[in-house]
UniProtKB/Swiss-Prot annotation:
Source organism of this protein record: Serratia odorifera
Pathway: Carbohydrate degradation; glycolysis; pyruvate from D-glyceraldehyde 3-phosphate: step 1/5
Stretch forming the signal peptide: none
GO molecular function, one term: NAD binding
Annotated compartments: Cytoplasm
Enzyme Commission number, as recorded: 1.2.1.12
InterPro entries in UniProt: GlycerAld/Erythrose_P_DH (IPR020831), GlycerAld_3-P_DH_AS (IPR020830), GlycerAld_3-P_DH_cat (IPR020829), GlycerAld_3-P_DH_NAD(P)-bd (IPR020828), Glyceraldehyde-3-P_DH_1 (IPR006424), NAD(P)-bd_dom_sf (IPR036291)
Any one GO biological process: glycolytic process
Protein name from the UniProt record: Glyceraldehyde-3-phosphate dehydrogenase
Catalytic activity: D-glyceraldehyde 3-phosphate + phosphate + NAD(+) = (2R)-3-phospho-glyceroyl phosphate + NADH + H(+)
Residues involved in D-glyceraldehyde 3-phosphate binding: S134, C135, T136, T165, T194, G195, R217
Annotated family: Belongs to the glyceraldehyde-3-phosphate dehydrogenase family.
Quaternary structure annotation from Swiss-Prot or TrEMBL: Homotetramer.
Amino acid sequence: IVFRAAQERSDIEIVAINDLLDAEYMAYMLKYDSTHGRFNGSVEVKDGHLVVNGQTIRVTAEKDPANLKWNEVGVDVVAEATGIFLTDETARKHIAAGAKKVVLTGPSKDDTPMFVMGVNLKSYAGQEIVSNASCTTNCLAPLAKVINDKFGIVEALMTTVHATTATQKTVDGPFHKDWRGGRGASQNIIPSSTGAAKAVGKVIPELNGKLTGMAFRVPTPNVSVVDLTARLEKPASYKEVCAAIKEAAEGELKGVLGYTEDDVVSTDFNGEKLTSVFDAKAGIALNDNFVKLV
């Protein structure tokens, strides 16, 4: 997904990929995607490297990032997407190998700074290694920021109805850390934990301790939903809340937060470029201090 997104931007050039897959299989997985469809471009393998739209991309299969010699191909930024090197200490091996910056594509397992577009990016101070948080945090944080800035959040609960992920089982199997997580993904709605709400407290410090949440894993291949149920400090009608979100989506958070009043469903957002889209018709309010936002 990172590669496909980069191909749509003229200011990003992919120069190298490190993966334990061989280049032929990598090319196959790039060409064909069951969720996002066929790749719009030419893909071939030459001398063990990928050639995409005529550009050669170095392919390596190193288990230790320290051996990657990023300096040989002029790497500026590494997207660390293995899910393994999620601490400053381990991700710093990329820096030792010649990269200038590292972006972790998931939440860090230590105190590595976490940034969410549209929320706390202005506080970035040139750190070499940062986390881009999780998909759920990127969905939740912009919405929570708007509500907290405009009305104040006293306390809130978040539920994400989350699409199936690669760690789940196709049929029941052992999963010692999470027994329910070991049940068949296509057969069940599976309650699960999520660190997304806690992560929001890191990118919006005012909400630290005011927000927690859980997840339901559901049998869909892509697109997830976040349900934010919040008690507001300043009373506001649901219409006023929607108006504030729409204003932010068309203003300071344009390109990050979206707003829709259409009768949409999850598949309508397959390939969505915005990190969060507020569904005005899906939410409800109990009163002027208690709202559910989707």
